[in-house]
């Protein structure tokens, strides 16, 4: 990783015809999870996991040197129990990559589990890992969990801008997707520009997401909805 290839080339960001699968946004201008995953993986300075070597590393594609960086790695099972944790500190010279931590496979675990990598307490990278190659069906066994949601929306010029804060309880809140609706018609409001979406939170984690969209309706009709993979049905 990063020895032969140091970047990605995006061939098509959307479907040129409807039968082709694979896109970052669709014909309705709704953004898919692939965009946020790609953007996260392309952060110029971040902690990453190499599944081939099972090591966590530090990537710096900027032209600036960094010193005394903190990388914290944690492994959780599907029940949200912390199985393993390790912290290391490192420096990163400009345009370098280095592997720092061996990431173990937890004893006694079978199926899917989660690796959380955080650099300097910033928004972490969350990896879904599994002991069964290509088999993530055990994710369906995640305990039900609904994140706490706090919103703050206001009008600025011709747009609405604001934030959505998601907070997890004692369980993992998996693959949270934020959507904006018109209360009166029940229709999606599109396009909406989010700073992040399709968010996974480990127990006790929280994240604030900014959003912006055209002010084409009265503020009182705006409805923020968060769908989660393991959220109980209403």
PLM regions: where:
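Carbohydrate-binding surfaces of carbohydrate-active enzymes
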Residues: 1-196, 202-211, 219-224, 232
